[in-house]
Amino acid sequence: MRFIEEFINKGYFHQCTDLDRLTAITKETKIAAYIGFDCTATSLHIGSLMQIMILRLLQQHGHKPIVIIGGGTSKIGDPTWKDEVRKILSKEDIAKNAEGIKKSLSKFIKFGDGKSDAIMLDNAEWLDSFNYLDFLRDFGSYFSVNRMLTMDSVKLRLEREQHLSFLEFNYMLLQAYDFYYLSKHYNCSLQLGGSDQWGNIVMGADLIRKISGKEVFGMTTPLLTTSSGAKMGKTAAGAVWLNEDLLSPYDYYQYWRNCEDADIVRFAKLYSEFTQEELNRFEILAAEDINAAKKQLAYELTKLCHSEQAAKSALETAVKIFEEGQIDENLPTVVLEQEVLQAGISAYELFHEAGLATSKSEARKLIRGNGAKINDRLVEDENMIINTNFLLDKNVIKLSAGKKRHILVRV
């Protein structure tokens, strides 16, 4: 199966500047294509997983993935579909986040010097050296403000009478220049992104056409939500991160294990590497035994992101907790100072400190709603003092928030 054919078959396709021509070119030759990521966190989360799988698919078909880390544009912030001005990051934060993002991506694609090896570039390399007057002189005449004002991402903010700074308004010019720079210096002929990036992508393709006459393409993916309308990558407990220092492989496994029934076949198609035959069998399994299908999906996706050993460990932990009622040391663990436990800590504070509630008020609400357990016993008093008497074997206390979220507190 060819790249574009598989791209469409897996459900990645939304829009393309010239699909027929791009299909023909990718059949005849290998191309370089890029996707950009802002440096807004020390890890990517599953909201970026489709884009990551596309980079992986490109590489598997012999094309060259280019990853752009927006060290330059992150200093401004993308206004696309954002209701508010984004916080501007320091150079130190951007560098730290870029390192974490490369760690996320390295789980899925190979970086190196080979023909199809991925490369990672920071657009600060070329944007930081910009002279503003030179940029206006050399590129300003190619951009139409009339057209920029009609783009949905800008129009939305204006219609709501929300602040859109000149700083953010320049973002689309810089992203267009990124595409031009990559086309000129890396022979990049395709930019990929979410459907919310369509306007920015088209502006870049137009800039290249006007300046150099090169044939380049833009292609977008649909914006994904769960079947209930929730945004991919976010849960009540926070983001579903790809890096294990922010989210344990067990919690990653549990996210997919607990996804909505209506989503599992679609997620298998988007995020797994099942062959068509395996996918057909998976669809049959999902119709006959939804829980078995969810376990298989969670296992496969955890293996892909972390390792087969991590997937096995997560599965074994889940079996011990949910099917055998045991405590497993592979559960996510937080460390509490022994002095704190000796002095005693209220139940609601402990749930907050352990990360099972984002605030103390949320922890109180969890307990009042009968959703909190300590050592598998319901917590009825939010002010109950938890001390060393609650320690189980191996000096741990098991905390549970609802039926699915568990954590060990270790001293």
Curated annotation (Swiss-Prot):
Q: What Enzyme Commission number(s) does the record list for this chain?
A: 6.1.1.1
Tell me one GO molecular function of this protein. Answer: ATP binding
The positions annotated for binding L-tyrosine are: Y34, Y171, Q175
Give the record's keywords alphabetically.
Aminoacyl-tRNA synthetase, ATP-binding, Cytoplasm, Ligase, Nucleotide-binding, Protein biosynthesis, RNA-binding
Gene Ontology, cellular component aspect: cytosol
- Per the Swiss-Prot or TrEMBL annotation, the motif 'KMSKS' region is positioned at 231-235
Renumbered ranges of motif 'HIGH' region: 39-48
Residue ranges constituting the S4 RNA-binding domain according to the UniProt record: 345-411
Q: Quaternary arrangement and interactors, per the entry?
A: Homodimer.
- This chain belongs to the protein called Tyrosine--tRNA ligase
